[in-house]
């Protein structure tokens, strides 16, 4: 079985990427593929952020020769810049690269200030994972003629045992926008 090095923000950081990686960590595939989580970022001041990045790079370079695949979870802006460093190193070591794209909005795909680094990260990947079919549309619109190997991977959620007797409640906590898919709940 190939071994997977997972590059993502810290377990102690709040947000979607941390939640997704924590959910994957509880799945059987985590053990099956001998996954190891490299924590590249933590909320806090600049010193803490630089410390996390520096220690993550050292750990990553030490472990990378023993792994086959690098699975990079990335958001936008600074996250893309950080993860480009890890992707370039993986390329030097001839590792397969999976980029798991978790952006908050599609607008940066079309913004010249950010789109170059995003495009470069996508080009380095062997597989690009996105959160919904809509993201495939936006990426294809932003980077026409791309040759990305894109696949949708929905965010995991824990299994829940349902009681036979239940009341009907709908709770939606989040931003009401089309990209979040609230219209599919109702």
PLM features per residue range, with description:
Residues 35-62, 72-83:
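A short, charged, and often flexible helix/loop element on the N-terminal side
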Residues 86-93, 111-127:
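Membrane-proximal helix-turn-helix segments that form the acceptor-binding/catalytic region
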Residues 1-42:
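N-terminal subdomain of nucleotide-sugar transferases
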Residues 3-6, 163-181, 185-186:
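Conserved donor-binding/catalytic core segment of Leloir-type glycosyltransferases
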Residues 75-79, 95-112, 126-127:
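A short, histidine- and acid-enriched strand-loop-helix "catalytic/donor-clamping" loop
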Residues 17, 83, 182-186:
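Nucleotide-sugar-dependent glycosyltransferases with a strong bias toward membrane-associated enzymes
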Residues 120-161:
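Donor nucleotide-sugar binding/catalytic pocket of nucleotide-sugar-dependent glycosyltransferases
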Residues 13, 158, 175-178:
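Nucleotide-sugar-dependent glycosyltransferase donor-binding/catalytic pocket residues
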């Amino acid at each position: 079985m190939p071994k997977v090095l997972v590059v993502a923000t810290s377990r102690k950081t709040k947000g979607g990427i941390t939640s997704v990686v924590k959910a994957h960590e509880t799945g059987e595939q985590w053990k099956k593929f001998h996954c190891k989580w490299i924590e590249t970022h933590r909320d806090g001041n600049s010193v803490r952020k630089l410390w996390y990045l520096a220690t993550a790079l050292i750990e990553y370079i030490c472990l990378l020769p023993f792994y086959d695949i690098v699975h990079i979870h990335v958001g936008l802006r600074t996250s893309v810049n950080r993860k480009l460093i890890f992707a370039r190193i993986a390329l030097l070591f001839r590792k397969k690269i999976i980029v798991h794209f978790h952006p908050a909005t599609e607008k940066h795909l079309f913004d010249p200030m950010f789109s170059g680094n995003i495009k470069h990260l996508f080009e380095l990947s062997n597989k690009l994972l996105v959160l919904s079919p809509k993201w495939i549309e936006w990426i294809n619109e932003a980077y026409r003629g791309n040759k990305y190997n894109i696949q949708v991977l929905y965010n995991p959620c824990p299994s829940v045992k349902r009681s036979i007797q239940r009341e009907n409640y709908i709770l939606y906590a989040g931003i009401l926008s089309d990209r979040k898919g609230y219209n599919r709940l109702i």
